[in-house]
Amino acid sequence: MAFAGLFGGVLLGLAARLGRFCTLGAIEDLYYGATSTRFAMWGIALGVALIGTFGLSAGGLLDLSHTLYLSLAWNPYASIIGGLTFGYGMAIAGNCGYGALARMGCGDLRSFMISVVMGVSGYVALGGPLSSTRLALFPTSEVGTHTPGLAHLVARHIPVDLHIVGITAGVLLVAVTLLHKGLRASPASIFWGAVVGVAVVSGWAATQWISANGFDRSIVISHTFTAPVGETLLYLMTSSGNTISFGTGSVAGVILGALAGCLIKGHMRWEACEDPRELRRQMGGAVLMGFGAVVAVGCSVGQGLSAFSVLAYSAPVTLACIVLGAVIGLRQLVEGFSRID
């Protein structure tokens, strides 16, 4: 299981450093910059992930109903509040969990701190002292009669196979994204966006195969980077009492892939916080990301890519709220409409 996560994680780490694939960077470029190429990379990543995921399902290699995001009933309040909290925390921390791991692989000690704090706060909300409060405010339950997926919804009301819906959505998304002139002028951006999509698909394929052929039936998952960071910390501290998981392999893969990318580009260097105020701000953002991702059942990668690739109800709502929360946080940092430190 860990090797499956490691493979996709390495691809994601390379995409972050060689392809500059970054959630917050894409939002910053779109909102404040003069280019939207990195934002367009998300369209390629999502399109490839949709085509690959629904292609796996059509070929009998993936049971969509067994995936994490389609096996839980959707709680819209959790998506909205968790997404906004995560997005805001991402902006004031300066990175999401995935981005922090990628930067940590290049020697950024600030990102090491962000990753640790986010992982711990996520586990506090997931299974620690605040888990009962979280469940009381945002209860989770198993799926009822209907699978909470957009492709399933369309297939219930229109006589069309749900796989055709998902694959068509992916093809259209890629086609529309390729209308972007800046993206077409950067073949490398198209390539690395596609690599991210392939990484997501590889996660579904591997965990489905392991679930179907392993000794114990397990949940089918793909990449996400909040709870797995906490899992990795627990494994490092108590390996005798914990098994290494897909998430642990994924976290290690991103760090190793980013390290390889930095060595290739010659960007490896040690960095640290410049002053205590910066450290305090980034720690606060990391705490918010940890709590927000657990409430929303996924981070910018977990909901924005993995959940989106199965067209879960939660994905577009959570991703939109993450973007909105990030824009609010960026405005606060850049335009200073209120103090945060």
Features from the language model and the residues they span:
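Membrane-interfacial helix-loop segments of redox and metal-homeostasis proteins
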Residues: 1-341
